[in-house]
Amino acid sequence: MRMKKCPNCKNYTLNTICQCGEKTITVKPPRYSPTDKYGKYRRMLKKSIKQ
């Protein structure tokens, strides 16, 4: 079983059909990269949330 997301209502589910009746799509995590382009911004956001 894989987690799926409804493109219509943006809900996550394990079913192939969402409660709204739309067919769900498989959610894929972002590809790993040693040179993370957005790591700087993610760390800045994390710091601002902690403060």
Swiss-Prot record:
One of its GO terms (molecular function) is snoRNA binding. Disulfide bonds: none annotated. GO terms for cellular component: ribonucleoprotein complex. NCBIfam families: PRK13130.1. Keywords: Ribonucleoprotein, Ribosome biogenesis, rRNA processing. Belongs to the NOP10 family. It comes from Methanococcus aeolicus (strain ATCC BAA-1280 / DSM 17508 / OCM 812 / Nankai-3). GO terms for biological process: pseudouridine synthesis; rRNA processing. Involved in ribosome biogenesis; more specifically in 18S rRNA pseudouridylation and in cleavage of pre-rRNA. This is Ribosome biogenesis protein Nop10.
